[in-house]
């Protein structure tokens, strides 16, 4: 019998009508919620959707584990650990011997796109299991991002390259050395002509020295750099403004007003962790303290834009014209000749006045993907406003050899095509996959007689090279790295290479006739040559211990703006959109395409990391896929939407319309996702998906946007044609899961209103009196643990989610299971909108277990599997749980997770290498949830008892709290009135989630406070 069609199809007209009503919902999670489709609400109101409550399919354990790869099937590793032979130095103290059950922490650093952050890595009996930020490192300040947190999973990934191969046959290291020696002997007579080296962005001092030595030995050889996430526009912009390469560093702790020109400085780019810390510390509404105001102009919603007091959606190509208009208003550019800001005159005038009024205490930050002119105008504006030396300083470049990387790669491609390359050594990267599509890098690569590739995975580039060398993970190798401010760190390994991988230093040593040297010797010898005076051994050990090399931060330099570039008589600069359209001959109805790095898989290098693939993206909440992001108005014009299936066999699945994108003869099909706040006429594609040789997790996931990315339009294109195909594609989106009912869950106001009424967050709501409760009153004689989460600080970066997953052995479940609402994350970040459909204000709300004092889950469990501890924790006793799921049904916060399958493969001994031994691995049929990191509480209690003292405030730091760069999460003893968490809970903007239910949650929230400009509209944003 055919099932009736009960799909919840999105109706954008109904959404707009609802928003225009005065009685409409003020805060909303999704477009479907506003459309008030009854089938959609049926989906939300059912605690366990049909496919999440019945085992309807025949997925067996063996079949399911194929989805897990790195998270579940670490069968390629030995169960024993392999410690490095060289002496590594643990952070703070070095015990005489390893104590079983007692973790050690080692300082190291992780480099991404040429910029490093300092880390402390937790090691259990020689096994790295968890990554934390190094509080002494200027780029991390103790915080981390999702990539650092997930890097430990990549370390144990069984899909990593495990053997050195020649034409896919396994060969020993000695065979490669012999081949290289013969090849170099033939090149040496010609000074190395025909030798090419391709790297990603290099900031390692030791690697830079090795490359310079190699080029000195082979003067006719060439070194090329290419990074798909490269900073070519930023480099070109500073060179245009100042005549040479320099490195801008922003001091946001001194900024009263910030203007972001398509810049997501809180979530990505060099120094983003520090910038997030500095920004949020100035966003707390403290008496007598000024609160930073943030303006954001962007084409696609970002984490930074979500935190803005005023956000202006605008096509990426139009931002250059706006920057020029702003420069003219502020005396930093030509007084006339551009109308780039004509459509937003009122908005631009108010921003210009605000910047003028805060001369010397404001800053303009250009986006990494914006044009060189936008960067140059931003520097000119900062110079004109007197910000240089205050909110922005300049140093010498952090990179070892800053170049135009696109031109560098283009030169290599031309040489390969002309047959001028005889030996190509590719150190890292995957140019066959991510080079500009018009370069046809794979075809040109096959013209090179000898090709060698060093990489973590046997990827698309490795497949076209004769020699593939397995690369050692950064937790397995010695190296060094530089942070955004030039601070150098020694990268020290915590475990010997699991697959006999080689570091980049060891591979280059083979090209300089020193193949016997280890990475440890190479790095140590370099720093010994740089050390002058004093005891080198003491210097070396201190550098390893601290995680930074003292005195290596680059000092500020004096620099002058190029007067011949921004002179008053210069001709007006055409907008990037005009330039592109004049070249491509685009039609008015054509769309602009914007390329962005994926918030989870980055440029594609993390595609095989299951933690990151299953991580809900901050704004879209998509997992295991990418989509073409469009505005509601664009979706209406194209006639595209999505539907939520409400039929029995597909209950809860999202099916999005598929469109065909055509640009310069290149065609790509992708599903569409509607994003409130997206610039109209602009389509955003996230890079990093559609891999063909990523591994069992990442291969075939999503669509490859690199196929539309050309050298002439790396970050934006105009003239792209979109066609509706009539097909639909299933997407795994979590924004429809775990819906909470009740009063507005997010509470926010303006700074002006907050100062008039500090208690706004609790107006009209009073918690029921304790004596009216049917629950027994708990008596607490000792510590009483609680948490406060500041909604004014959280910008939705997701670091806490991955940190929780790594700390608590939380498995991934795969795309199909996510579509059934079975994801296992203990901590979720709900995203809420407020205001208009086309430009809403965005808020993020982390939701862990509330650890209620009157916990609804405890009273319904028939076997006492969820109980109340003496310190107020809502504990889980896993071996009692029989899987009734009554507790989850009765939880108003929807924070409990059930193991419908045996998601965690605890039978595989090698999996112990990854897992935290202090946390129980759960089995099928067991409920689980946030525990407030009870293992960390117990460890601190044991230490305090040994020293006969109470637990100090701040001694216990939960995994989510430790990872957060914004310090949005604070944990501690609420019975201590002097503790930080108690002081936060005493603030008037502190409120309980669903407090009217009398659950008395231990986790509470601090309401968000925005700082809008009175000249501009805030709540009902006009978008002018």
Feature roles, as predicted:
Residues 1-342, 349, 598, 602-605, ...:
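N-terminal export/assembly segments and adjacent metallocofactor-ligating motifs
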Residues 196-198, 258-261, 363-365, 422-427, ...:
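Structural motif
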Residues 268-288, 436-452, 487-490:
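A short, gly/pro- and small-residue-rich
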Residues 288, 310-416, 527-536, 540, ...:
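Active-site phosphate/pyrophosphate-binding segments
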Residues 419, 433-463, 467-476:
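Hydrophobic alpha/beta core scaffold segments
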Residues 457-491, 823-824, 829, 895-911:
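Flexible glycine/proline-rich, aromatic-decorated loop/lid segments
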Residues 489-552:
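Long, C-terminal catalytic modules of enzymes
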Residues 529-620:
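Long, low-complexity segments enriched in small/aliphatic residues
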